[in-house]
Amino acid sequence: MKLIKSCILFFAFVILWSCSTEKNKVLNREFHNLHAKYNGFFNANEIIKVTYNDFLKTRKENYNSILPIFPLPSLEQSKNWYAPMDTAYRKCELVIFSHRMPHAKKGKNRNREWCKYIDDNWMTMGKARFYKKYLPNALKIFQYVENHYEIEDNYYESIFWQSKVLIEMGAFDEAEEILLSLIIKFEEQQLEAKDQEKLTVKQKLRLALIYKEIIDYLESKEPVISPNIINKIYPTLADLYIQSKSYKKAIENLEIAVENKYKKAFKTRLFFVLAQLYHLENNFKASLYYQEVVERNPDYEMAFQAKINRALSFSGRDYKAIKSQLLKMLKDDKNIEYFDQIYYALAEISFKNNAEELGK
């Protein structure tokens, strides 16, 4: 029996020793990658996702003001996030402590970190602090990723998230500078990529065969800004400009954003906010975008508000269609509590239409 116990202890010691963070072997890397991905990064992100979705389900939209592009908890509401965000944070913190494998070899393996999910865990810790409204701490974490993982995919993601933190802190000029610089950098990288495509076959063979040139080439490479980050920048810029009341700039960025691909609900939200901004400017495009929202079949309340606002933004176009839509809404029992809004909208379009007729 003692022999069996001794063997078990021996093999346990061998396994633990073989998975040391100091040993850079394939088995070690896979062991630490697996734990860093699922024990920290994946589980922590699931906690954040579930908490955010629960928040959205219980949240009530205020259609009397411009909708926030990215709904976030208020300072008071964020207190309900403390426990889940702390859990997510601790999971990632433990993973970083237990599984990071620092390394500084040059060439194609010149990563500062052999465990490829460590920077992802840092990013998740930053997001947990962001949603908890610990903004200075979140900013420091994203800055840490920028300074220590400059060759990883999360390098530019960390810079982007710094802008989101700065927006919530009210540092609009700093956030704007970051976001615009990312767009400029992306455009520069696109041009460089086109130049790389122009390399001759001889030059490509030279890069492939001469070791020193391979090393020099890899050392000179930098992380690429993904189109996914650029897609997130335009709604974020619009959010910044709305919060700073620069509505014309917000419209410009939303016009770009709605041309990109997003999940249906988020894109519908962008159309609604764009319609609201045009409505503020008494621009006929408001009516067009409210109709776009209706046609995208959103939830009942957003569809209702889009129909009402379309009528209120009426500028002499499609009078009959809008009136018909409002009269149809009066026949729906679900709208009983909103009848006052519908009658008000009918009166508004009738008044505007009569004014149009008199002006002819």
Where is each model-derived feature located?
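Acidic, polar-rich low-complexity tracts and alpha-helical solenoid repeat scaffolds
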Residues: 19-360
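Positively charged n-region of N-terminal signal peptides that target proteins for export
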Residues: 1-6
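Bacterial N-terminal signal peptides
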Residues: 7-16
